[in-house]
Regions:
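Conserved glycine-rich FAD pyrophosphate-binding loop
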Residues: 3-4, 52, 77, 84, ...
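General beta-strand structural signal in soluble alpha/beta enzymes
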Residues: 24-28, 58-59, 79-83, 101-103, ...
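Short amphipathic alpha-helix segments
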Residues: 246-277, 361-378, 405-413
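N-terminal flexible segment immediately upstream of the FAD-binding catalytic core
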Residues: 1-70, 86-116, 272, 277-283, ...
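Helix N-cap motif at beta-to-alpha junctions
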Residues: 243-246, 297-304, 360-364, 401-406
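FAD-binding subdomain of flavoenzyme oxidoreductases
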Residues: 110, 125-126, 133-138, 142-257, ...
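A conserved active-site cap/scaffold subdomain adjacent to cofactor or substrate pockets
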Residues: 243, 254-256, 261-263, 268-321
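Short amphipathic alpha-helices in soluble, non-transmembrane regions
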Residues: 15, 72, 250-257, 302-317, ...
Length: 487
C-alpha cells in the first residue's frame, strides 16, 4: 500500500475527531513521542531524523484499542505501536506518519501464579516487579515468596513489557534464563488483528514468539504471559582489575559458577569506567581510574562465593551495596549496564557509537581477547554475560566504537564476522537487516493473518513485498509455515 502523506494526515484527523472521547495528542509532543534512541547511530540519525506521526492516541482499555484499530483499518491509516520509546534503532518511529498507538496507559498486572505472570502490554517493568515482589497469598492465607521478571532491560524504570517483547532481546537476568526467545520465557500472547472489525486471538508458545522482536510489524500484542523468577535480595558490587584478561576471566568464572546465584555480570574495559565516572558524578569513588570494571548483581546469600572468586582472580571490590541500601537510595548500578553504558559514554564523547555482537559459546573468552587485540583502542569492549537459547554460558557485546565513517563502521562489523562473531547490526531499521538477518516466511505469514492491509509500522519488514511468493512457495511445499489459529 502506498501512503500519500496528505491523505494519511486527513485520515488521522478524521479518526481523532470521530473518537474524541479518547486521549489524543496532536501538539508538539507528537515529535518527541515519534522518536526513540535512534540517534545512538550516526547512520540512523541521518536517515530517520524529522520523522513524526500525525497524532498519538493513548487508549486505556481493549475497547478503546479496538475502536482506534478498526477506524485506522477502514481509513487505510498506518499504525505504529509504542511502549515507552526506549528502543535504539527506530523500532517505534513511523516512516509514513499516521497514528502512534501509545500503550503506556494499558498497564494492568492481570494475575500472578507461582512462576508465571500475565499483564497488559503497556505495564512498566519496574511497576510489574514491584507488585509481584510482594508475594502471593496461598490457600491458607499466608504470604508466599515474591517473583520478578526473568529479564529486564537497563531501562526497566520506563520500558514496557510489550516494548521489550516487540523491540528488545533480553537483558539483566538473561545470564540465568537466556534471551526472551528462550523456550519457557514467553508462554502466550493475546493479539489483535488490524481489520475494520478487529479480532482477538490467543497465541501460545511457540507460535507466541512469531510476533517477538519484529518491531510491531506483524501483529498488535495486547497481553503477555511470561515465566517469572524468584525474587531475591540482590547485592550490587563493582570489582576492578588492572588486567583486561583477569577481568574477563573473572566475569566468565562468576557467570559460569553454578553455586553462585546471580542476576547480572557486565564487563566494562578501560577506558569505559573513566567515561562513566565523568558522565555520572554520583559514581565518584566507585571505580578505580584506568581500571577494567566488572559490575555484578548476586543474591546476598551468595556474597561469600563472590568474594572467593574476586580473590581467585586478583580483583578489588570498589563498590558494594545491599538490597536495602539500593532500595533506600533509589539508585541501581543496573542503569550503567547494557545500553545505558552507551548512553552515559556518549554524554562525554559524542563521537562514540556502538555495535551489537554475539560470541560463540565455549569460544567467547578467546574471541573477546582476539578482537580486543585486533582492534585496539578503536573499539572499547563492553560485554554482557548471558546464556544462549540452548543454555550455554556466553557473552554478548555492546562495544563502543570511535566513529570515523560509515565505511569504517561497516568494516569493524565485518572484521567481527570474519572472526566468527555474530553481528546484530544496530545501524539499520529494517527487521531483516538487523537481528533477523534474512526474510522469515513465518513472520510474513503472521503479518498476512493479523495485518492484511500492511498498516502496522509499514516500511520496516522487507519480506512484506515478497508475501505472494512466500505463499506460493508454501502452497507448493517449498516452505513450511508455522501453524496459526484460524480467525
Amino acid at each position: 500500500m502506498n501512503f500519500e502523506p496528505a491523505a494519511v494526515a486527513r485520515g488521522t484527523a478524521d479518526i481523532a475527531a470521530s473518537l474524541g472521547g479518547l486521549e489524543w495528542i496532536t501538539d508538539n509532543r507528537v515529535e518527541r513521542l515519534s522518536q526513540d534512541f535512534y540517534w545512538f547511530s550516526p547512520i540512523l540519525k541521518r536517515q530517520l531524523e524529522g520523522l513524526r506521526a500525525d497524532a498519538v492516541v493513548r487508549p486505556k482499555t481493549e475497547d478503546e484499542i479496538r475502536a482506534v484499530v478498526g477506524a485506522c483499518a477502514k481509513a487505510g491509516v498506518p499504525i505504529t505501536v509504542r511502549g515507552s520509546g526506549t528502543g535504539n534503532y527506530g523500532q517505534c518511529m513511523p516512516l509514513h506518519g499516521g497514528v502512534i498507538l501509545d500503550l503506556s496507559a494499558y498497564k494492568q498486572l492481570l494475575w500472578v501464579k507461582p512462576g508465571v505472570g500475565r499483564a497488559q502490554a503497556g505495564i512498566r517493568m519496574m511497576e510489574m516487579d514491584r507488585q509481584m515482589q510482594q508475594g502471593i497469598k496461598g490457600p491458607d492465607g499466608r504470604q508466599g515468596p515474591g517473583w520478578e521478571l526473568r529479564c529486564v532491560p537497563s531501562t526497566f524504570r520506563s520500558a514496557t513489557l510489550g516494548g521489550l517483547y516487540g523491540g528488545g532481546f533480553g537483558g539483566v537476568g538473561s545470564i540465568n534464563y537466556g534471551p526472551l526467545a528462550s523456550t519457557g520465557n514467553v508462554l502466550g500472547v493475546r493479539a489483535m488483528s488490524i481489520e475494520p472489525e478487529p479480532k482477538v486471538v490467543e497465541l501460545r508458545a511457540p507460535e507466541a514468539l512469531l510476533l517477538h522482536h519484529v518491531y510491531g510489524t506483524n501483529g498488535l500484542v495486547l497481553e503477555l504471559e511470561v515465566g517469572l523468577a524468584p525474587a531475591h535480595p540482590w547485592l550490587e558490587a563493582i570489582v576492578c582489575f588492572d588486567s583486561f584478561d583477569a577481568a574477563l576471566e573473572f566475569g566468565d568464572a562468576l557467570a559460569s559458577a553454578p553455586g553462585i546465584v546471580k542476576k547480572s555480570v557486565t564487563l566494562l574495559a578501560a577506558p569505559i569506567p573513566d567515561l562513566l565516572l565523568q558522565a555520572v558524578p554520583p559514581l565518584a569513588g566507585t571505580m578505580t581510574a584506568g581500571s577494567h570494571a566488572v559490575i555484578v548483581l548476586v543474591a546476598e546469600f551468595s556474597e561469600a562465593g563472590l568474594q572467593q572468586t574476586v580473590a581467585q582472580f586478583g580483583g578489588t571490590v570498589t563498590y558494594r551495596k545491599t538490597a536495602a541500601e539500593v532500595q533506600a537510595s533509589n539508585r541501581t548500578i543496573v542503569e550503567y549496564t547494557w545500553n545505558h553504558t552507551t548512553l552515559h559514554a556518549m554524554k562525554v564523547d559524542k563521537g562514540l557509537t556502538y555495535i551489537q555482537s554475539g560470541f560463540q559459546a565455549g569460544q567467547h573468552v578467546a574471541q573477546a581477547k582476539a578482537m580486543r587485540q585486533r582492534l585496539g583502542d578503536e573499539v572499547l569492549v563492553h560485554l554482557e554475560f548471558i546464556r544462549t537459547k540452548e543454555g550455554a554460558m556466553n557473552c554478548s557485546g555492546l562495544q563502543l566504537i570511535r566513529y570515523r565513517s560509515d565505511e569504517r563502521l561497516n568494516q569493524i562489523m565485518q572484521i567481527h564476522r570474519d572472526h566468527g562473531v555474530y553481528i546484530a547490526n544496530p545501524h539499520v531499521y529494517i527487521v531483516e537487516d538487523g537481528k533477523q538477518g534474512q526474510v522469515n516466511p513465518d513472520v510474513v505469514a503472521t503479518k498476512m493473518r493479523f495485518d492484511p492491509q500492511g498498516l502496522l509500522n509499514p516500511g520496516k519488514l522487507r519480506g512484506w513485498a515478497q508475501r505472494e511468493q512466500i505463499m506460493a512457495d508454501a502452497a507448493a511445499g517449498r516452505v513450511m509455515l508455522a501453524t496459526l489459529p484460524r480467525f
